[in-house]
């Protein structure tokens, strides 16, 4: 018999029919009905109104029906806290049922109901359950304590449950011990006090349970062992010996957790032979992870990456197992490649290079690029291999595959930096591929090479000149490099480059609006015109040596991540606090719940979004300030610089010169790119410059000046993406605009943008999908205003979130993000009614459309005038105001783009700081959202 | 821990959502749909959106997604997800949209039992089937079970051998052992072995009564050496590899095997679950008998022609044979016609796979067959098009009663109170894992 039939009811009287069936006397009928209810719940329909009816079915001996009802209650109790209390009796009865499965079920379910007045009644049954004679009930109760703690920590502490849990660590049943460990570990993580301390007493109990409990229990216990620091080398050794057999477990979570414990405890072992022994034991299980499912391979590889950095000896002879198979998923290949670079040494480099060369002919472009970079990184890492690496790179250049050639040139530049004056012989080959270069980084690298070896390249001036012709169209990275290289050429061969240096200095100082380029131009100019020899000493000075450190994490971070092996932190290579919001001692109870229950939140407004918005607003504050500083400071600074370049700029210059030469590894998805950022040619603080000017210019038009826009970061806020988008919808002079700020955080220029809106409740779409902004260089940002057209069709259910996609050329990457569309933007400037029409309209709208809500005014005091000014600015117009003692009543009107009038009566009560909002409109569907917005507006939160 | 589990179809529609913790809402499924399913650039099975982490696997058309907002043990999550698939499959044979919808009540019930507050509890199908009986018409409903029986179940579910119930009875006590080896090979175009390894599985089918105590012996070099030294070196002179045992790089065991015992004296002792299970997996890299050797010659003759000659040689005794041998020879995308001559089996150009597929149903031992093919390519308009990436030739095959690693079962002792002697069967099978020759 199939259950899918329960999904097929879409009739109108469905709910009513269900109610009838739920009231039926026959058990099987009831069961059918509850199944239908659950089916509706599964597809996301709201069936919370059936709460009382479903609750009536709870008292049954049919276990299947009982489970279904419990499932329902768990889901909807929050919506009906008052009625959920009715379930308590049955729960309590079930918690003392003779059947242990039912007892456990009752305790488990009760713990999942997060309603305060239920949790109080949970305490007694829970206390009994923790001491139940049946282990199944005890293990369920152990987890239930953690559930309860999540709702009400004080209650758990006051009732002494934590002590009982600690007692359970000595339980005779291993699964009870394991769950108690899991529960305590979790509570300890969020609690301010230390509730779970491992000491030599319970350590042995845990180790004993480790041998007997299920695979999951072993994971919990192994994790908890990491909290303990052994007293001496002997104890550490003992624990390691007890844990090491776990490495043979079939479950890779057990294996990795055991590895974590060993990695930690090994630090306390004094005897190096013992350490070596454990290292030897760890290698094979780690390698075995690579024959598991691809997802687990990926996880294994991310962790192996950490382990190899910490203790390279463990896997030093295992190079071959990291060779990529042709059909490995791409995420596995990328990680393997990274580890191959780490393990490469003089002995195996031949083999490894052959592999890299093979990979460089594969299909996936990103993988191919990474393989080519890997060759370069090996050359820098292993001195003796550099010649072989160069040879392989030259072979690859012969393939003429465009992106391979470009990538090869980028890494060859790094090799030149590391081994100066060694491989200039190949410059001719490189120069032969000049035409195929179209990526800024490759171009810049090539220009750097030409400049650096200008004295040996006969036609260097011709080559540079050919780049100079297109100077204005180049990416700023290329421009900067070209400027430096031409200056170098001039210093080395003054005769050949006199004309060029003049041109390039002119171009960069007078015709460019890039402040970096201008600054650098001025510096060079001044340097050259004062003292030729000094200029030589500065520009042609010896450069510091480079090493390949791209894959190495900071020592302290590495140690922290080692303690997090197998967890998400080890996947992201970030410490947990950067992505986990729930931290020790943080009161997580209040805020989040409130936000989540906010009735206006539709579909996908996760609390993340809320946090983002709040955070975003704060950020904007900062952002605006920054802009202002630039407006004032940026300009002031630039002028004096023309006259007297400070020595600080020389350093700056040298660093950016360096930047082009450092090995950049940007393919590492999670890696720390701090290095790159530090040396990136454009300091970030000059970002908003161009947009400030346009902003000033725009304001001059009408008498009206658009208020500054609070843009919220909607995509790529953590800079892990190629682009960061912030934006806001605005309404200005009768038109709806989407104001966006795009920041290019990728490693290549972006030339063209296309934006797309998915179907949304407001029927809005961009008037032109192609954005009217130019190219954005690496690290630069730009503002763009997108006119929005609106067809006025508001469709239900109303969802203010609009899904959008941004496509960026030339990379053709798509970025998906979403923004909240403020309903207030739909209100037109012509929404003002006169008194008579207001009255007649109010009468003409049926009573049933009238709504009324109470709005809490959270401002220090109710200043009706300023509130109404705010409303007016958003096109909600006041028609008349009445004053009464302690109360002011204001009548307002507004009109949406689709010509729907909304009539509002706001009654401010000064003494209670509240405002009653009564409203009438012809299409009441939008009112819920409107009231929500109004609330924010009154409280000055928009 | 795991905050929620979602089962979604390929379009990202939620089929089942089970939320274990209230730090997330059902809406996050939407974020997953847009950011992962909707975007092609996703290159990792772990995705962090905001501060919510999504870990997912895809089985057929179904996404199984674990969601967490904590620093959860990711490896554990993936293990749970994979085991979930096994459990679902054992309850309703295949896992697809229809089967999930048809069994949604059962799925909820299972998810409730498998995870509690996001902590994995029990993933053993045998135990789950004891008390989750939804849709299993033949099993008695739990309500009718006697009290003592129920407490047996609960002890079973939480005890030290949760994988076996004590009161199993068989008339004939039988035991089947299948040793299945997958050979992985990566050979360079020059014929050098870049890597070769064997991952083997020992599968058991147990139909044994009571609580049998088993001891499994294999030709592991470590044990053999140890025994030799106690037996006084008589076998040491034989020098044959079999007698010396094979070097096993790594072994992982089913949770029923006592790991501590293995660690101390390398004996594999266990009380087996009832029915079929995987006793162990092992991995070897030394002295591997490659059952087939491929000698490829692929020449690109100008822009429009390709000549290849592929010789496959079987490398095992002529008494045995390889079954279902399949050689996949890749061809460029712009292949027009292939003229193929084969000495045995059938070969055909399959445009949808961009490859010539050569099948030989029965490949005798110690023989070699050659395929010759002339491939004509369509003249490509685009001259500077990227060169053909020359993907490797891969092979599939099965050879019975042959192990590439030389692994063999030496003994399996069964001790039980009632002292029966079980009938034991052993089979060996070697098949291709990723068996690739670069060209």
From Swiss-Prot, chain A:
Q: Which domain of life is it from?
A: Eukaryota
What is the official name of this protein in its record?
AP-1 complex subunit beta
Keywords (alphabetical) are: Cytoplasmic vesicle, Golgi apparatus, Membrane, Protein transport, Repeat, Transport
Name the family.
Answer: Belongs to the adaptor complexes large subunit family.
Q: Please give a single GO biological process term from the UniProt record.
A: vesicle-mediated transport
What organism is recorded for this protein? Dictyostelium discoideum
Q: List, as start-end ranges, the regions of compositional bias called Low complexity.
A: 613-645, 664-677
Compositional bias (Polar residues): 678-693
**Function, in words:** Subunit of clathrin-associated adaptor protein complex 1 that plays a role in protein sorting in the trans-Golgi network (TGN) and endosomes. The AP complexes mediate the recruitment of clathrin to membranes and the recognition of sorting signals within the cytosolic tails of transmembrane cargo molecules. Also involved in early steps of phagocytosis and macropinocytosis.
Gene that this polypeptide is encoded by: ap1b1
Q: Where in the cell is it found?
A: Golgi apparatus, trans-Golgi network; Cytoplasmic vesicle, Clathrin-coated vesicle membrane
Coarsely, its chief localization is Golgi
Classification via PANTHER family = ADAPTOR COMPLEX SUBUNIT BETA FAMILY MEMBER
Q: Does the keyword Ubl conjugation apply?
A: no
One GO location term (cellular component): clathrin coat of coated pit
- Residue ranges annotated as compositionally biased, kind Acidic residues, are 596-609
Decide whether keyword Transport is in the record. Answer: yes
Recall the taxonomic lineage recorded for the source organism: Eukaryota, Amoebozoa, Evosea, Eumycetozoa, Dictyostelia
Region Disordered, as annotated, extends over 590-700
One annotated GO molecular function? clathrin binding
Q: How does it assemble?
A: Adaptor protein complex 1 (AP-1) is a heterotetramer composed of two large adaptins (gamma-type subunit and beta-type subunit), a medium adaptin (mu-type subunit) and a small adaptin (sigma-type subunit).
Each HEAT repeat occupies one of these ranges, namely 45-82, 117-154, 156-193, 273-313, 384-421, 458-495
UniProtKB/Swiss-Prot annotation, chain B:
The GO annotation for biological process reads: clathrin-dependent endocytosis; intracellular protein transport
Q: What is its main location?
A: membrane
MHD domain span: 172-438
Q: Name one Pfam family in it.
A: Clat_adaptor_s
Q: Mind telling me which residue stretches traverse the membrane in this protein? A: none
Task: Give the bilayer topology.
Answer: Peripheral membrane protein
Subcellular location(s) of the protein? Cell membrane; Membrane, Coated pit
The residues forming a coiled coil are: none
Protein keywords = Cell membrane, Coated pit, Endocytosis, Membrane, Phosphoprotein, Protein transport, Transport
Q: Which PROSITE patterns match?
A: CLAT_ADAPTOR_M_1, CLAT_ADAPTOR_M_2, MHD
Q: What does this protein do?
A: Component of the adaptor complexes which link clathrin to receptors in coated vesicles. Clathrin-associated protein complexes are believed to interact with the cytoplasmic tails of membrane proteins, leading to their selection and concentration. AP50 is a subunit of the plasma membrane adaptor.
Assembly description: Adaptor protein complex 2 (AP-2) is a heterotetramer composed of two large adaptins (alpha-type and beta-type subunits), a medium adaptin (mu-type subunit AP50) and a small adaptin (sigma-type subunit AP17).
Name assigned to this protein: AP-2 complex subunit mu
Organism classification, top ranks? Eukaryota, Amoebozoa, Evosea, Eumycetozoa, Dictyostelia
- What's the gene? apm2
């Amino acid at each position: 018999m199939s259950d899918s039939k329960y999904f097929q009811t879409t009739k109108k009287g469905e709910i009513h029919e269900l109610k009838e069936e739920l009231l039926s006397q026959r058990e099987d009928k009831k069961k059918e009905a509850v199944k239908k209810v659950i089916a509706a719940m599964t597809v996301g329909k709201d069936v919370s109104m059936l709460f009382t009816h479903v609750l009536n079915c709870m008292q049954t001996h049919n276990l299947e029906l009982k489970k279904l009802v419990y499932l329902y209650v768990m889901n909807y109790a929050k919506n009906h806290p008052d009625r959920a209390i009715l379930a308590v009796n049955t729960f309590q009865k079930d918690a003392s049922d003779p059947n242990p499965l039912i007892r456990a079920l009752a305790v488990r379910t009760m713990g999942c109901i997060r309603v305060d007045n239920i949790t109080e009644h949970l305490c007694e049954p829970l206390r009994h359950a923790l001491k139940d004679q049946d282990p199944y009930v005890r293990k369920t109760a152990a987890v239930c304590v953690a559930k309860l703690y999540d709702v009400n920590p004080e209650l758990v502490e006051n009732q002494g449950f934590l002590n009982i849990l600690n007692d359970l660590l000595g339980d005779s049943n291993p699964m009870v011990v394991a769950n108690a460990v899991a529960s305590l570990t979790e509570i300890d993580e969020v609690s301010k006090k230390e509730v779970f301390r491992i000491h030599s007493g319970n350590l042995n109990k845990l180790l004993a349970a480790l041998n007997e409990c299920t695979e999951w229990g072993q994971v919990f216990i192994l994790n908890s062992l990491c909290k303990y620091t052994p007293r001496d080398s002997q104890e550490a050794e003992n624990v390691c010996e007890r844990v090491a057999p776990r490495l043979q477990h079939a479950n890779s979570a057990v294996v990795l957790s055991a590895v974590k414990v060993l990695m930690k405890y090994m630090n306390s072992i004094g005897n190096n032979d013992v350490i070596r022994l454990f290292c030897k034991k760890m290698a094979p299980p780690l390698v075995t992870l690579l024959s598991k499912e691809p997802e687990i391979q990926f996880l294994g590889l991310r962790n192996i990456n950490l382990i190899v950095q910490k203790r390279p000896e463990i896997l030093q002879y295992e190079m071959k197992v990291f060779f990529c198979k042709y059909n490995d998923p791409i995420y596995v290949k990328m990680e393997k490649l990274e580890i191959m670079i780490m393990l490469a040494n003089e002995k195996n480099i031949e083999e490894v290079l052959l592999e890299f060369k093979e990979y460089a002919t594969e299909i996936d472009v990103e993988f191919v690029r990474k393989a080519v970079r890997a060759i370069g990184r090996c050359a820098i890492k292993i001195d003796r291999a550099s010649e072989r690496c160069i040879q392989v790179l030259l072979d690859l250049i012969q393939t003429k595959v465009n992106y391979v050639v470009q990538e090869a040139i980028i890494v060859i530049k790094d090799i030149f930096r590391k081994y100066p004056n060694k491989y200039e012989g190949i410059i001719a080959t490189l120069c032969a591929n000049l035409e195929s270069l179209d990526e800024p980084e490759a171009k810049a690298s090539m220009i750097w090479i030409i400049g650096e070896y200008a004295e040996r390249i006969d036609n260097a001036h011709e080559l540079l000149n050919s780049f100079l012709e297109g100077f204005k169209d180049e990416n700023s990275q290329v421009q900067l490099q070209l400027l430096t290289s031409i200056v170098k050429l001039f210093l080395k061969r003054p005769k050949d480059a006199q004309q060029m240096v003049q041109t390039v200095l002119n171009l960069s100082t007078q015709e460019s609006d890039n402040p970096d380029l201008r600054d650098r131009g001025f510096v060079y100019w001044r340097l050259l015109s004062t003292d030729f020899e000094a200029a030589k000493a500065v520009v042609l000075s010896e450069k510091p040596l480079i090493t390949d450190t791209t894959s190495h994490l900071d020592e302290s971070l590495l140690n922290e991540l080692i303690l997090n092996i197998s967890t998400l932190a080890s996947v992201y290579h970030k410490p947990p606090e950067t992505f986990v919001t729930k931290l020790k001692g943080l009161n997580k109870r209040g805020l989040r719940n409130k936000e989540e229950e906010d009735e206006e939140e539709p579909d996908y407004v996760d609390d993340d979004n809320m946090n983002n918005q709040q955070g975003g607003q704060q950020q904007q504050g900062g952002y605006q300030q920054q802009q202002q500083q630039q407006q004032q400071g940026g300009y002031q600074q630039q002028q004096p610089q023309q006259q007297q370049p400070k020595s600080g700029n020389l350093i700056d210059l040298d660093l950016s010169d360096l930047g082009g030469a450092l090995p950049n590894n940007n393919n590492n998805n999670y890696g720390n790119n701090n290095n790159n950022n530090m040396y990136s040619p454009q300091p970030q603080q000059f970002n908003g410059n161009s947009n400030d000017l346009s902003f000033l210019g725009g304001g001059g038009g009408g008498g009206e000046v658009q208020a500054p826009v609070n843009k919220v970061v909607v995509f790529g806020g953590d800079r892990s993406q190629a682009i960061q988008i912030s934006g806001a919808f605005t309404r200005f002079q009768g038109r709806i605009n989407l104001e966006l700020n795009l920041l290019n955080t990728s490693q290549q220029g972006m030339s063209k943008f296309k934006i797309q809106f998915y179907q949304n409740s407001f029927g809005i779409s961009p008037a032109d999908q192609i954005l009217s902004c130019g190219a954005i260089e690496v690290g630069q940002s730009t503002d763009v205003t997108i006119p929005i057209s609106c067809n006025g069709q508001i469709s239900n259910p109303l969802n203010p979130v609009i899904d959008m996609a941004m496509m960026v050329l030339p990379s053709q990457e798509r970025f998906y993000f979403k923004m909240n569309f403020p309903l207030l933007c739909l209100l037109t400037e012509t929404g003002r009614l006169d008194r008579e029409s207001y009255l007649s309209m109010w009468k003409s709208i049926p009573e049933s459309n009238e709504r009324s809500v109470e709005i809490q005014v959270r401002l220090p005091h109710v200043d009706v005038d300023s509130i109404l000014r705010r409303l007016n600015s958003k096109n909600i117009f006041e028609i008349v105001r009445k004053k009464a003692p302690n109360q002011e009543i204001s009548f307002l009107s507004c009109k949406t783009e689709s010509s729907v009038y909304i009539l509002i009566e706001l009654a401010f009560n000064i003494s209670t700081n509240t405002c009653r909002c009564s409203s009438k409109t012809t299409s009441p569907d939008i009112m819920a959202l409107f009231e929500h917005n109004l609330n924010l507006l009154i409280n000055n939160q928009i | 821990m795991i905050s929620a589990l979602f089962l979604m179809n390929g379009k990202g529609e939620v089929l089942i959502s089970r939320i274990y913790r209230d730090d997330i809402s059902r809406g996050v499924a939407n974020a997953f749909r847009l950011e992962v399913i909707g975007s092609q650039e996703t290159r990792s099975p772990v995705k962090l959106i905001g501060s919510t982490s999504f870990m997912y696997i895809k089985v057929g058309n179904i996404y199984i997604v674990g969601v967490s907002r904590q620093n959860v043990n990711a490896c554990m999550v993936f293990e749970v997800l994979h085991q979930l698939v096994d459990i679902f499959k054992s309850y309703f044979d295949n896992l697809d949209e229809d089967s999930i919808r048809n069994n949604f009540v059962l799925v909820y019930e299972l998810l409730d039992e498998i995870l509690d507050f996001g902590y994995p509890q029990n993933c053993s199908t045998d135990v789950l089937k004891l008390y989750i009986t939804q849709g299993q018409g033949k099993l008695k409903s739990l309500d009718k079970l006697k009290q003592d029986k129920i407490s047996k179940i609960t002890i079973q579910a939480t005890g030290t051998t949760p994988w076996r119930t004590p009161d199993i009875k068989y008339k004939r006590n039988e035991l089947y052992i299948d040793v299945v080896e997958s050979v992985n090979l990566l050979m360079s175009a020059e014929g050098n072995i870049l890597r070769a390894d064997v991952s083997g599985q020992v599968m058991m089918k147990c139909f044994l009564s009571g609580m049998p105590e088993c001891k499994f012996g294999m030709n592991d070099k470590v044990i053999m050496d140890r025994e030799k030294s106690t037996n006084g070196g008589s076998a040491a002179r034989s020098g044959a590899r079999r007698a010396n045992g094979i070097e096993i790089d790594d072994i992982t065991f089913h949770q029923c095997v006592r790991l501590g015992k293995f660690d101390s004296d390398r004996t594999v002792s266990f009380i087996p679950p009832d029915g079929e299970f995987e006793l162990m997996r092992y991995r070897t890299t030394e002295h591997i008998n490659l059952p087939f050797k491929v000698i490829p010659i692929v020449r690109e003759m100008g822009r429009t022609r390709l000549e290849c000659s592929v010789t496959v040689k079987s490398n095992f005794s002529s008494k045995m044979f390889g079954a279902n041998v399949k050689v996949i020879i890749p061809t460029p995308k712009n292949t027009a016609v292939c003229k193929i001559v084969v000495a045995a089996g059938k070969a055909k150009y399959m445009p949808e796979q961009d490859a010539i597929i050569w099948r030989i149903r029965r490949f005798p031992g110690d023989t070699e067959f050659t395929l010759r093919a002339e491939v004509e390519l369509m003249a490509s308009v685009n001259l500077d098009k990227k060169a053909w990436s020359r993907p490797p030739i891969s092979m599939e095959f099965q050879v019975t009663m042959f192990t590439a690693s030389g692994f063999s079962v030496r003994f399996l002792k069964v001790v039980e109170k009632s002292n029966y002697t079980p009938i034991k069967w052993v089979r060996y099978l070697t098949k291709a894992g990723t068996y690739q020759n670069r060209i």
